[in-house]
Amino acid sequence: MEKLKFNYENNTLTIKILGDIDHHSAKNVRENMDKLIFDKKPSLVLMDLSSVEFMDSSGLGLILGRYTTCEEIGAEFRIIKPAPSVSRILSLAGIERLMKIEGGYRNEA
C-alpha cells in the first residue's frame, strides 16, 4: 500500500492518497481502498487528496467508485483537502453535487 496511508478512529476511516492518480496507479489504489473499506466497515470514509498534484479521468473513476462502494455499505464518503489542481478537476466534473468536499476546494454557490 505504498500509495496510501490510513487511519481508523471512532468509526472513521481516513485514507490519504500519496502521489498522482492516473491509469497506472488507479487500479492498485482502488484495490487497497476497497480492502480497507470492506475490512473496517466504517460509517465515514474521508479521502484525503492533499498530496495529489495530478489526477486524470482514472482518478474521477476511482472517486466515484469508492463513493458507490460506501453507499453500498451504508457509509458516508467525503473528499478532504484537495490540492488546487485537483480541485479544478473536481469542480469541472461537478463532483460536489454528489458528495461533500472539505478544505481546499469548496462550492461557493
Regions found by a protein language model. Name each.
Residues 63-66:
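Histidine-anchored nucleotide/phosphate-binding helix
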